[in-house]
């Protein structure tokens, strides 16, 4: 850690404290994420080290760059490029989102980052507005924390005992699927897309069952016909209330028809029917976007 200096604590992430820091030689501002691993008596698991070293290879303009990994006895520090604004803060404070061109540009950049990660077989698993970071000067957006869930797992609570949000979690995960893949991230993107347009979360559940019911009451309760295999997922219950699906145009009323078409393809309950990131980038919703 000699080459890095902590400047101030800037937040508490899913895995530990996040500091604003400085590279002593270059003076570059960086973000230092301290990953706490108290439960590991024998130090940092080698699987985590392997996963994290793979992430250093990931380089894309829409992904927050992992610059370095510093390995201490009881913790790991991850050194990232520094960005001080996230999509949640931006949505809370900026009138920009009334302008659908901004929403479209941010959505496109999210998808571009995800397509890159998925092409390298890396999932995010915990996408939410708080880990989409924005560069104020250029309005460019970058995904943070990609691949960390695989290295460290997703805790139920953060180390400060805050509950990790369920609002963006895919139905197959909520239903206990052991094997899931890239569609889980596309579900999260759909939730974030709707939230940017509506300026409020689409499925703000406060428990796993409440989250499922919020999803089913809009998307319809799944069954073997609409989602083959759903009944054999560990947490599926045949006595779930049977909701019909609702027209998304009533749920996201200001979104145009091509936007609604894309959103509906991201929010398919059956993950095998969900659109993938590459196909989403080609969707007609983006045809009038000036791509930088």
Curated annotation (Swiss-Prot):
Identify the catalytic residues.
126
Positions contributing to ATP binding: 10-18, 33
Catalytic activity annotation: L-seryl-[protein] + ATP = O-phospho-L-seryl-[protein] + ADP + H(+); L-threonyl-[protein] + ATP = O-phospho-L-threonyl-[protein] + ADP + H(+); [DNA-directed RNA polymerase] + ATP = phospho-[DNA-directed RNA polymerase] + ADP + H(+)
Positions of modified residues (Phosphothreonine): 14, 160
Q: Name one GO cellular component term.
A: NuRD complex
* EC class of the enzyme, as a word: transferase
**A GO molecular-function annotation:** protein serine kinase activity
A Pfam family per the record: Pkinase
Tissue and organ expression note: Expressed in the dividing region of the root apex and in differentiated cells such as those in the sclerenchyma, pericycle and parenchyma of the central cylinder. Expressed in the intercalary meristem and the elongation zone of internodes.
> Which keywords are on file for this protein?
ATP-binding, Kinase, Nucleotide-binding, Phosphoprotein, Serine/threonine-protein kinase, Transferase
Q: Which residues form the Protein kinase domain?
A: 4-286
Q: What induces it?
A: By gibberellic acid (GA3) and submergence. Down-regulated by auxin.
Q: Which residues carry this modification: Phosphotyrosine?
A: 15
Q: EC no.?
A: 2.7.11.22, 2.7.11.23
- Give the UniProt record's GO annotations in the biological process aspect: G1/S transition of mitotic cell cycle; regulation of G2/M transition of mitotic cell cycle; regulation of gene expression; regulation of meiotic cell cycle; signal transduction
Q: Which family does it belong to?
A: Belongs to the protein kinase superfamily. CMGC Ser/Thr protein kinase family. CDC2/CDKX subfamily.
| Protein name, per record | Cyclin-dependent kinase A-2
